[in-house]
């Protein structure tokens, strides 16, 4: 079974929030998944849709698959590196601010 894959790295969203959008499209056809992400209202959905579109384009150009026959086989959201910042607080203290990043992996295949 042939499949096409797309990976987006260092996306500036928390993996926990991005996984909410990933759960919406797991196992759906590509057209349904695209609609679901477009109208989900989630930032993660908007970002994940770009990776899904890239995987579909890879399938169409490299493997000569048709968009209508594609299905989302796997969606993975992994944690990327965390940018650590600090917010100054009273009496010389500070509170940490963790700016988390994510890596998206989307795999599509024929139905």
From Swiss-Prot:
The GO terms describing molecular function are: rRNA binding; structural constituent of ribosome
Provide the family line: Belongs to the universal ribosomal protein uL22 family.
Q: Which GO terms describe its biological process?
A: translation
What pairs make up the disulfide bonds?
Answer: none
By what name is this protein known?
Answer: Large ribosomal subunit protein uL22
Supply the alphabetized keyword list. Ribonucleoprotein, Ribosomal protein, RNA-binding, rRNA-binding
The protein's matches in PANTHER family, at most eight in alphabetical order, are given as:
CHLOROPLAST 50S RIBOSOMAL PROTEIN L22-RELATED, LARGE RIBOSOMAL SUBUNIT PROTEIN UL22M
Q: Which organism is it from?
A: Protochlamydia amoebophila (strain UWE25)
Q: What InterPro entries does this protein's entry cite? A: Ribosomal_uL22 (IPR001063), Ribosomal_uL22_bac/chlpt-type (IPR005727), Ribosomal_uL22_bac/org-type (IPR047867), Ribosomal_uL22_sf (IPR036394)
Role: This protein binds specifically to 23S rRNA; its binding is stimulated by other ribosomal proteins, e.g. L4, L17, and L20. It is important during the early stages of 50S assembly. It makes multiple contacts with different domains of the 23S rRNA in the assembled 50S subunit and ribosome. The globular domain of the protein is located near the polypeptide exit tunnel on the outside of the subunit, while an extended beta-hairpin is found that lines the wall of the exit tunnel in the center of the 70S ribosome.
Subunit text: Part of the 50S ribosomal subunit.
Q: Does the keyword Transmembrane apply?
A: no
Q: Does the keyword Cell membrane apply?
A: no
GO cellular component terms, semicolon-separated: cytosolic large ribosomal subunit
């Amino acid at each position: 079974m042939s499949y096409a894959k797309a990976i987006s790295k260092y996306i500036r969203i928390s993996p926990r929030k991005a996984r909410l959008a990933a759960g919406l499209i797991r196992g759906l056809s590509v057209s349904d998944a695209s609609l679901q992400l477009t109208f989900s209202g989630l930032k993660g959905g908007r970002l994940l849709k770009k990776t899904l579109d890239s995987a579909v384009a890879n399938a169409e150009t490299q493997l000569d698959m048709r968009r209508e026959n594609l299905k989302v086989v796997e969606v993975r959201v992994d944690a990327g590196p965390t940018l650590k910042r600090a917010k100054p607080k009273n009496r010389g203290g500070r509170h940490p601010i963790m700016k988390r990043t994510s890596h998206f992996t989307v795999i599509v295949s024929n139905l």
